[in-house]
């Protein structure tokens, strides 16, 4: 316990947290935790304390508004990704079309989000209810395509993992059965390359699992906003927290 709470570890954690918060996307993740944490607590306090329900609602609204400011400019990043998709070898392949729908969905999600912010502060006059619905539709399809693409990539990674695992096992058996010969050094180099490739596949697979969990959690929120399925406020709060924590973990300075 003493080692876990030691000063060097605390300083390292604090340094990583500062680096995370130095990024606008890092601030967005922290604000998202506050936003959906407040939604969850508001649900818990619903039958206990009206005062704390009001406090949590204000925290949720304030955090959500702050996130809209920090997400300004995200359209530019999505625009670059969309343009890059037209430069690939076969831009109209099925997965590339899905990727185009995904990036277009996220692009318009940010556009509508910016317009809502502009309306809220008085720069423009739009129907924020309609903009919110359009934003949710764009977000929903962007997330859905992301999950489909990730599941396809996951299937490929699982096949590679199985193949490489069999190769590594077979190489170990061969090494135990054979005497040391002139090919030992070459075999060791080849085995190391295979093991490195295997480790990369495992890393990629775990990253996909995290992406699916994150996007799946966000999809629950988008589905509720579109009234596809009426998840409870508590479920929405938990989903938002899970998504934000995974996003923060993926951004955490290594």
UniProtKB/Swiss-Prot annotation:
Protein's GO biological process: peroxisome fission; peroxisome organization; signal transduction
Q: How does it sit in the membrane?
A: Multi-pass membrane protein
Q: Which UniProt keywords apply?
A: Membrane, Peroxisome, Peroxisome biogenesis, Transmembrane, Transmembrane helix
Give me the segments passing through the membrane.
Answer: 92-112, 228-248
Which stretches are Cytoplasmic in the membrane topology? 1-91, 249-254
Q: Which InterPro entries match?
A: PEX11 (IPR008733)
User: Where does the record say this protein resides?
Assistant: Peroxisome membrane
Principal location listed in the UniProt entry: membrane
Which cellular component, as a GO term, is one annotated location?
Answer: peroxisomal membrane
Lumenal compartment ranges equal 113-227
Similarity comment text for this entry: Belongs to the peroxin-11 family.
* Function comment: Involved in peroxisomal proliferation. Could participate in peroxisomal elongation or fission. May be involved in parceling of peroxisomes into regular quanta.
Record's protein name? Peroxisomal membrane protein 11 homolog
């Amino acid at each position: 316990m003493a080692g876990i709470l030691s000063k060097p570890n605390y300083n390292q954690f604090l340094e990583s947290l500062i680096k995370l918060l130095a990024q606008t996307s890092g601030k967005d993740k922290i604000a998202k935790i506050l936003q959906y944490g407040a939604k969850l607590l508001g649900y818990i306090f619903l039958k206990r304390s009206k005062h704390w329900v009001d406090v949590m609602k204000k925290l949720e609204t304030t955090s959500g508004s702050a996130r809209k400011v920090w997400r300004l400019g995200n359209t530019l990043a999505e625009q670059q990704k969309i343009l890059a998709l037209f430069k690939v070898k076969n831009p109209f392949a099925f997965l590339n079309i899905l990727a185009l729908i995904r990036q277009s969905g996220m692009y318009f999600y940010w556009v509508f989000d910016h317009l809502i912010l502009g309306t809220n502060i008085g720069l423009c006059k739009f129907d924020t209810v309609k903009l919110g619905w359009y934003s949710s539709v764009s977000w929903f399809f962007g997330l859905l395509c992301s999950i489909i693409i990730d599941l396809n990539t996951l299937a490929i990674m699982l096949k590679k993992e199985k193949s490489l695992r069999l190769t590594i096992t077979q190489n170990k058996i061969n090494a135990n059965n054979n005497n040391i010969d002139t090919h030992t050094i070459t075999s060791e180099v080849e085995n190391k390359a295979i093991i490195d490739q295997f480790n990369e596949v495992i890393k990629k697979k775990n990253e996909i699992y995290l992406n699916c969990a994150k996007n799946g959690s966000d999809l629950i929120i988008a589905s509720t906003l579109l009234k596809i399925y009426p998840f409870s406020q508590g479920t929405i709060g938990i989903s938002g927290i899970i998504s934000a924590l995974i996003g923060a973990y993926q951004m955490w300075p290594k």
